[in-house]
């Protein structure tokens, strides 16, 4: 076994994902985490007093209270003030990383029950002004910086994230047509799963205000199930002439959060929790920043090797859909079985709120694996700057 102790998922919930500037735009990342965490505590019948640690992933730190995020989430959901909290940032892998950190705390017996999660409000990413605190003269031309837009460029290699995906398209000979067809598949799979109610077990509905008054939001807002291939083919490439990445085949800018509660085997017995899945293992790897999207390849390979398993053992595989060519490069490199990979659509359809996606993917795999009667699943994400992260779970159903 890859972990030193048995670690189990006892609850896994996520909010619906809101479109950029959509129904969730007025909720901070802290608010969104609170919704997910409350739902997870309730679903797992976990008393806040039993939680030993709170670990939340968040990337953009977009709200004024963001530096307190994990701490505020813990206090808001009733976890005792004596219980410590930690906010972490491994970019797009932050939701997964919260679970990794939680496993580590449990394995070294620093904690028995950990509230993990990831969250992002990309709609609330502020405009900011740099280098004006000192020496700014009267009448200076103040330049506003879009913190969301600039964050999507890796300054170390001077490449926007989309261009790292274009690099993979060239390297793996991936065509624009293949990218659009994959994007359409993501939308169609999301629609089929949503219509069938496959997201119900993971979803934590939110009450939102609209022009028509208050309503309950329980469906991902970003998805465009009516999309056609013809519409996708008409969209212009965003970053490169004759490129492959368009607004239609890239992950959606979104708002949302997820929460995953993990517990040691001892805690499961002591508190009579119902284990939904076991955390089998995890792996984090670095890769070339100019093709950061290939990160899931070494991450999945490393996690499988540590666990003594193979891709053939996996009943479900999730690779976060940052960009269609990025996903397709991973699919080709690992020779993934498309019948069990991203089976209910992914971030191209429902959006990618940076810190929230790892928690969303984990929650989905936990419930989908049980629904299908499968045994093993692996979830993964590429990470800006050139990294990959993967977590393997085993159903306990």
Swiss-Prot record:
Modified sites of kind Phosphothreonine: 119, 136
Positions where N6-acetyllysine occurs in the chain: 25, 137, 143, 171, 191, 209, 234, 241, 269-270, 305, 312, 340, 375
Protein location: Mitochondrion
Highest taxon listed in the record's lineage: Eukaryota
Signal peptide: none
Alphabetized UniProt keyword annotations: Acetylation, Acyltransferase, Fatty acid metabolism, Hydrolase, Lipid metabolism, Mitochondrion, Phosphoprotein, Transferase, Transit peptide
EC number annotated for this UniProt entry: 2.3.1.16, 2.3.1.9, 3.1.2.-, 3.1.2.1
UniProt-annotated site: Increases nucleophilicity of active site Cys, residues: 352
In-chain residues carrying the UniProt-annotated modification Phosphotyrosine: 127
PTM-bearing positions, type N6-succinyllysine: 25, 45, 137, 143, 171, 191, 209, 211-212, 214, 234, 240, 305, 312
Catalytic activity: an acyl-CoA + acetyl-CoA = a 3-oxoacyl-CoA + CoA; 2 acetyl-CoA = acetoacetyl-CoA + CoA; acetyl-CoA + H2O = acetate + CoA + H(+); propanoyl-CoA + H2O = propanoate + CoA + H(+)
Transit peptide as recorded in UniProt: 1-16
List of catalytic residues: 92 (acyl-thioester intermediate), 382 (proton donor/acceptor)
Result after altering residue 92 to A: Decreased acyl-CoA hydrolase activity
Function: In the production of energy from fats, this is one of the enzymes that catalyzes the last step of the mitochondrial beta-oxidation pathway, an aerobic process breaking down fatty acids into acetyl-CoA. Using free coenzyme A/CoA, catalyzes the thiolytic cleavage of medium- to long-chain unbranched 3-oxoacyl-CoAs into acetyl-CoA and a fatty acyl-CoA shortened by two carbon atoms. Also catalyzes the condensation of two acetyl-CoA molecules into acetoacetyl-CoA and could be involved in the production of ketone bodies. Also displays hydrolase activity on various fatty acyl-CoAs.
PANTHER family reported in the protein's UniProt record: 3-KETOACYL-COA THIOLASE, MITOCHONDRIAL, ACETYL-COA C-ACYLTRANSFERASE
Record's protein name: 3-ketoacyl-CoA thiolase, mitochondrial
Organism whose genome encodes this protein: Homo sapiens (Human)
């Amino acid at each position: 076994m890859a972990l030193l102790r048995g670690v189990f998922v006892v609850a896994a919930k996520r909010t619906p994902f809101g479109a950029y500037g959509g129904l969730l735009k007025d909720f901070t990342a802290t608010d969104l985490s609170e919704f997910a965490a409350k739902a997870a505590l309730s679903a797992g019948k976990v008393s806040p007093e039993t939680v030993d640690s709170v670990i939340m992933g968040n990337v953009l730190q977009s709200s004024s209270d963001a530096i307190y995020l994990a701490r505020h989430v813990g206090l808001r959901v009733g976890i005792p003030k004596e219980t410590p909290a930690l906010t972490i940032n491994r970019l797009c892998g932050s939701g997964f990383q919260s679970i990794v950190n939680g496993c580590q705390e449990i394995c070294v017996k620093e904690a028995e029950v950990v509230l993990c999660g990831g969250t992002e409000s990309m709609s609330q990413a502020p405009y900011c002004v740099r280098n004006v605190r000192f020496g700014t003269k009267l009448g200076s031309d103040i330049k506003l910086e879009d913190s969301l837009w600039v964050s999507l460029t890796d300054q170390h290699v001077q490449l926007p994230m989309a261009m790292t995906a274009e690099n993979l398209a060239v390297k793996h000979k991936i065509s624009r047509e293949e990218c659009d067809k994959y994007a359409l598949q993501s939308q169609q799979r999301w629609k089929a799963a949503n219509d069938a109610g496959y997201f119900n077990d993971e979803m934590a509905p939110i009450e939102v205000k609209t022009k028509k008054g208050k309503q309950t939001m329980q469906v991902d807002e970003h998805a465009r199930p009516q999309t056609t291939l013809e519409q996708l083919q008409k969209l212009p490439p965003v970053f490169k002439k004759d490129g492959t990445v368009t607004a239609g085949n890239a992950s959606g800018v979104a708002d949302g959060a997820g929460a995953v509660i993990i517990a040691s085997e001892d805690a499961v017995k002591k508190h009579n929790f119902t284990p939904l899945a076991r955390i089998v293992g995890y792996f984090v790897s670095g890769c070339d920043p100019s093709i950061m999207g290939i990160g899931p390849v070494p991450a999945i390979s490393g996690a499988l090797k540590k666990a003594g398993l193979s891709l053939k053992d996996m009943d479900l595989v999730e690779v976060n859909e940052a960009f269609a060519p990025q996903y397709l490069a991973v699919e080709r490199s690992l020779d993934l079985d498309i019948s069990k990979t991203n089976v209910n659509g992914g971030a191209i359809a429902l959006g990618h709120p940076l810190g929230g996606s790892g928690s969303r993917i984990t929650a989905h795999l936990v419930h989908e694996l049980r629904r299908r009667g499968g045994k093993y699943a692996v979830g993964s994400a590429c990470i800006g700057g050139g990294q990959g992260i993967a977590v393997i779970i085993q159903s306990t159903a």
